[in-house]
């Protein structure tokens, strides 16, 4: 009887943690919606509750941490949010080097950090890997998000933008 009860509790806890876990699309949509400090903080708190078992979860955890820098008034906190967030994204990329979504996340963060901070050293590599592989990306929504970002940024040359637009 006690064994059955323990199994039911373990099953309930597993289901509860599954329901709290955010899927890739939900994380993507929530990240795209991080337009205020409150939304960003809410996303950060929610993603902290999950145990990042997948590289994409680790990547989004790092991206939202880095994004918190945008809303912090403290320069040291801004720097540390970016540094720690980029470190998390880079660790995820080490194990999933061709995941375009992870490359996109790092590219978004690094391309928006002032160059004098020295944290934008992966921009060229990430851009190149994305440009080389975006044509074969099966996720249409992700492809559209990445293409739109690149077309509206100053990261790509006119030639690269023409290739993306076609």
Located regions from the model:
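Helix-turn-helix repeat elements of alpha-solenoid scaffolds
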Residues: 31-46, 78-86, 119-120
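Short coil/turn linking the two alpha-helices of tandem helical-hairpin repeats
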Residues: 34, 67-76, 112-117, 154
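Terminal, low-structured helical/coil segments at or just beyond the last alpha-helical repeat
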Residues: 130-166
């Amino acid at each position: 009887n006690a064994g059955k009860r323990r199994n039911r509790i373990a099953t309930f806890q597993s289901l509860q943690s599954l329901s709290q876990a955010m899927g890739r699309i939900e994380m993507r949509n929530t990240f795209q919606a991080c337009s205020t400090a409150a939304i960003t903080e809410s996303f950060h708190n929610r993603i902290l509750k999950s145990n990042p078992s997948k590289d994409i979860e680790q990547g989004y955890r790092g991206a939202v941490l880095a994004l918190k820098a945008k809303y912090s008034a403290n320069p040291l906190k801004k720097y540390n949010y970016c540094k720690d967030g980029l470190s998390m994204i880079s660790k995820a990329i080490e194990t999933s080097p061709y995941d375009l979504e992870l490359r996109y996340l790092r590219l978004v963060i690094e391309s928006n950090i002032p160059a004098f901070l020295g944290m934008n050293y992966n921009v060229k590599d990430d851009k190149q890997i994305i440009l080389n592989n975006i044509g074969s990306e099966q996720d249409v929504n992700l492809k559209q998000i990445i293409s739109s970002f690149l077309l509206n940024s100053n990261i790509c040359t006119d030639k690269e933008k023409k290739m993306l637009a076609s």
